[in-house]
Amino acid sequence: MIRELDLLQAGCIHVIEHNDQTINFAAQELVRYLEAITDCGIALKSAEQYDQREKGLWIGLPCDFPHSPFLVDEQEEYDDALWIDVSGGQGIISGVNPRSVLFSVYRFLNELGCRWVRPGADGEYLPKADIGSFTVRVYEHASYRYRGICIEGAVSLEHVTDMIDWMTKIGFNSYFIQFREAYFFFERWYNHLNNPLKLPSGDFNVEVARAYVALAKQEIQKRGMIYQAVGHGWTCAPFGIVGLSWEKWGDEVDPETSQFFALVNGKRELWQGIPINTDLCYSNSEARSKMIEEIVLYASLHPEVDLLHVWLSDGFNNQCECEQCVLMSPSDLYVRLMNELDEGLTALGIETRIVFLIYHELLWPPEYEKFINPDRFVMQFAPITRSYRQSFSTIEGVSDVPPFFRNKVDLPQTVEGNVSFLKAWQSRFKGDSFDFDYHFMWAHQRDPGYVHISRMVYEDIRHLHQIGLNGFVSCQVQRAFFPNGLGMTVMARTLWNKELSFREMAEDYYASAYGEDGPLCLKYAEELSELYFDLNLEKETDRNEVDRKSCFQNIYSLIRQFECVIEKNIHHANPCHAVSWRHLGIHAEIWTEMTRGLELLDRGEVEQALCIWEGVKTMVWKNEENCHRVFDVYNFVGVFDEIFSVKAL
């Protein structure tokens, strides 16, 4: 039934017609959630213009309402801001663009007590509420322009679409699909790589992957998100060599093609047999032209792409050593390529913006070449070799960039070392830029409590503006919610408002995810995280002296003592909380055994340690069906296979 006038017709939502799918979706989401939390029907009406005599909630753009706080003409295309002015369940929900209108709807629901602690319906915490009793007034601009996630890990279509759906609920505005078809990420899931207990699906192929990407794009577009695409593969696709992943190419390469490859150690061939790791002879104008033709063709066929990533190879110390290439730095040749690409796009009236990457050898800035049209480009800083035990907040100063020696580079390991390259680039490029980082690619697996890595991403994001960056795109596994989504929530909320308190966000998250025992759970996670930070699974050379034996014993004791709290809550009355506690129960079992294996490895009892690790793998393989929405088993096994293969901790 339609809710009657106890709220003075606040049970009606008016959406001002813009023929925009994102605004319409925002209105539908508001109706759906309000009906869930009020147990009443909510009417949805379309209107041509605002009429303050009509009671209820009004959804539209700032231009639809009198006295809008926005100066729309001054707003950058990708910047987000929201405006909510609701009193007694009536008023305005607006945003500076359609995407921001959707953010405003979710923010309004957040103020009513709704929370989304992980992707999927079982991650929704929806309290009962009477919207007529609420006054919500919010006027905010996002702290950073770029707030995104990049596909990585092993994924199903549902994992991806659930993630996209969840992202806008907490303030992310961009999604990046690597490669043209994201084949390898889907293949890892559908062929169950790293889980021998599951059989490959048998019907997965490249065409299926392309269909999945098309469906994911529909979800991105429905929400008005910034769509980023490709990155890898531009150095091989122009020559008919398919680069779907980091696997070796099985066919012969004819000399007409290999003449364009980088000359390394006297040979022009695929670098280590891997197409996407192979650089080209960038001083060769024909090689550049072939790349540019391929990129321009793709851009012309895909106008839906907002930010097109144009990267070189994913290898390093493999730059061309021919007599022409050695006269210029790799970055000088890269900027020359970018300028020629801009010329080609401009000639066809294509306005797609291009993301260029500073990474590996390209960390060293150009010496001579300059961007002719910097507004076309966005700089992506990718400090993949950095430590995740230090944040950008610890930087007191940066040193000069070391000299560049072709094919003899040592990549920086410290945060300061990486940022020194960023600063050098910023002296040559004054345009838009963001951090492309990897907190939840590998490092999160080494922090079972997730609190340290969550605080690290918080500190990094809070200080992005201090190192001249306007956002953050996280290259990461999509299922980084095990034991929970604290880190992902902190990432999104801090990107929206860098002044938020980590402690307050953590307390709110744990209360929303776990209920009344959330504070106990947070304390447990903090202690587990701190103990594993002391053990330091990242780098042996960076370890402090700690009593490792006591550390391991404290971990066992901590998990054992907390098991009774898990058991008490495993059948919690709230379905969202119950699922959170079930995940935590599986997590405790896994990490009890993981700790045994790591302790044995630390003591040098390698054979016994490997035996425990094999048992843990069997445990996670068997449990994958119960926690696959939150836990990337493929990634977990890969990270710890590497640690145990070293046969020392």
Name what the model sees in each region:
Residues 1-143:
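Contiguous, structured surface segment used for ligand recognition
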Residues 16-20, 38, 48-52, 63-69, ...:
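Aromatic-lined carbohydrate-binding surfaces of glycoside hydrolases
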Residues 44, 516-523, 577-578:
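Short, surface-exposed acidic
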Residues 503-522, 604-611, 617:
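Carbohydrate-binding surfaces of carbohydrate-active enzymes
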Residues 541-649:
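Histidine-centered catalytic/metal-binding microenvironments
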